[in-house]
C-alpha cells in the first residue's frame, strides 16, 4: 500500500551535494519520505536531526530518517551523491578510478535490498558513472538517469538572461554532451521567447557573437571557478536534482537535459550523455532528438567519443 500512496527517496551520500539536495527536497515538499544513507553514520544522523528541526517550516511534513541499504527496498527513487570530490585542478574525468569501485559497492548493495525503482546519479564524472550504474544494476536503461547537463543548461540560461536582460524562464537553450570539458551549446535551437538568438544577432548590433562565445566558456568553466573560490559546487546541482525528482515523482513528462542512454539517437550508440529527454514516473520516457547543424553534430560526436574511450577501459562491450 505504501508504494501506491507514498513517495520514498533514498539518498546515498550526505556530503555537500547530498545534504543540499535533502534540504532543497524538504523545502519544496516533493517527497513523503527521505532516508539518508552514508558511510559516515554520525554525519547522516546529524543531518537528519538538523533537517527535522526545520520541518515545522516546510510546506508539508516529510518523514526523514537515517537508514541503511535495506531501506532502498521500498524506495521509488535512489539518488546517488556519494563519491570522491573534484579538487582544484582536477577534471571530472580524473575522478573515474576513484569512484568506479565505490559505485560497484553502492549499486550492488542497493540491488540486494530488492530495489525496483529509478536511479538518479549525480556523482562525477556523471555520464560515466550513470552508465556504470546501469551496468551494475541490470535495470532497464530508462530507469537509470544522470544529472547530465541540467546544471550547465541552467547556467547557460541564466547568463543569457543577464546578457539579453530577460527572465531566465524566457530563455530556451540547451547545453548537451558530456557534463564536462567537451560539452557544447546548441546555438541552432537557442531562443529568447520564440525568437532565435541567431536572428536577434543579425538584427541588432548591440549583441555580438563574441559575447555569446564568452558566455559559453563561462558556462563550461563555471565549476572550476566555483571550486577555486569555495571548494565545491552544491547548491545549483542540488536544485537541478530536485527538479528531476519532481518530474519523476509527479509524473510531469518534463523535458530536462539529463544523462540518458543513446541507442541510435544523434547517431550515437551505447553511451550515457547529456541530451534533452522527457522525464516521468517511469524514468526517461524518450530522448528528444534535436536537429543539430554540422558543427554541433561533430562536437557532439567528439564528446560521445571521449566518454566511450573512457568507458571502454572498464566495460568490454563499449567500442
UniProtKB/Swiss-Prot annotation:
Family: Belongs to the LDH/MDH superfamily. LDH family.
Binding residue positions for beta-D-fructose 1,6-bisphosphate: 157, 172
Organism: Geobacillus sp. (strain WCH70)
Keywords assigned by UniProt, alphabetized: Allosteric enzyme, Cytoplasm, NAD, Oxidoreductase, Phosphoprotein
Role played: Catalyzes the conversion of lactate to pyruvate.
Subunit structure, as described in the record: Homotetramer.
Coiled coil: none
Enzyme Commission (EC) number: 1.1.1.27
Name by which UniProt lists this protein: L-lactate dehydrogenase
Active site residues per record: 179
Reactions this protein catalyses: (S)-lactate + NAD(+) = pyruvate + NADH + H(+)
Residues reported in the UniProt entry to bind substrate: 86, 92, 124-127, 152-155, 233
Domain of life: Bacteria
Residues carrying Phosphotyrosine: 224
Keyword Repressor: no
Amino acid at each position: 500500500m505504501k508504494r501506491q500512496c507514498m513517495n520514498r527517496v533514498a539518498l546515498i551520500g550526505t556530503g555537500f551535494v547530498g545534504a543540499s539536495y535533502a534540504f532543497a527536497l524538504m523545502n519544496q515538499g516533493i517527497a513523503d519520505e527521505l532516508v539518508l544513507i552514508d558511510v559516515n553514520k554520525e554525519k547522516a544522523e546529524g543531518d537528519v536531526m538538523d533537517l527535522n528541526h526545520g520541518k515545522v517550516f516546510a510546506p508539508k511534513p516529510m518523514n526523514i530518517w537515517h537508514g541503511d541499504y535495506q531501506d532502498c527496498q521500498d524506495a521509488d527513487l535512489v539518488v546517488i551523491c556519494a563519491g570522491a570530490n573534484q579538487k582544484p585542478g582536477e577534471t571530472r574525468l580524473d575522478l573515474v578510478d576513484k569512484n568506479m569501485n565505490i559505485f560497484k559497492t553502492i549499486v550492488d548493495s542497493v540491488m540486494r535490498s530488492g530495489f525496483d525503482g529509478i536511479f538518479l546519479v549525480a556523482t562525477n564524472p556523471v555520464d560515466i558513472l550513470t552508465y556504470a550504474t546501469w551496468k551494475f544494476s541490470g535495470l532497464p536503461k530508462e530507469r537509470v538517469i544522470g544529472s547530465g547537463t541540467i546544471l550547465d543548461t541552467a547556467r547557460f540560461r541564466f547568463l543569457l538572461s543577464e546578457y539579453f536582460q530577460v527572465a531566465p524562464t524566457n530563455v530556451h537553450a540547451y547545453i548537451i554532451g558530456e557534463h564536462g570539458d567537451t560539452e557544447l551549446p546548441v546555438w541552432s535551437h537557442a531562443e529568447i521567447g520564440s525568437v532565435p538568438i541567431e536572428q536577434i544577432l543579425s538584427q541588432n548590433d548591440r549583441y555580438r557573437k563574441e559575447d555569446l562565445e564568452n558566455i559559453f566558456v563561462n558556462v563550461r568553466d563555471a565549476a572550476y571557478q566555483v571550486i577555486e573560490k569555495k571548494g565545491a559546487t552544491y547548491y545549483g546541482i542540488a536544485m537541478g536534482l530536485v527538479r528531476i525528482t519532481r518530474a519523476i515523482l509527479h509524473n510531469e513528462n518534463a523535458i530536462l537535459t539529463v544523462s540518458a542512454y543513446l541507442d541510435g539517437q544523434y547517431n550515437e550508440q551505447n553511451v550515457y550523455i547529456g541530451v534533452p529527454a522527457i522525464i516521468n514516473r517511469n524514468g526517461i520516457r524518450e530522448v528528444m532528438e534535436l536537429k543539430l547543424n554540422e558543427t554541433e553534430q561533430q562536437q557532439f560526436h567528439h564528446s560521445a567519443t571521449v566518454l566511450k574511450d573512457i568507458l571502454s577501459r572498464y566495460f568490454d562491450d563499449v567500442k
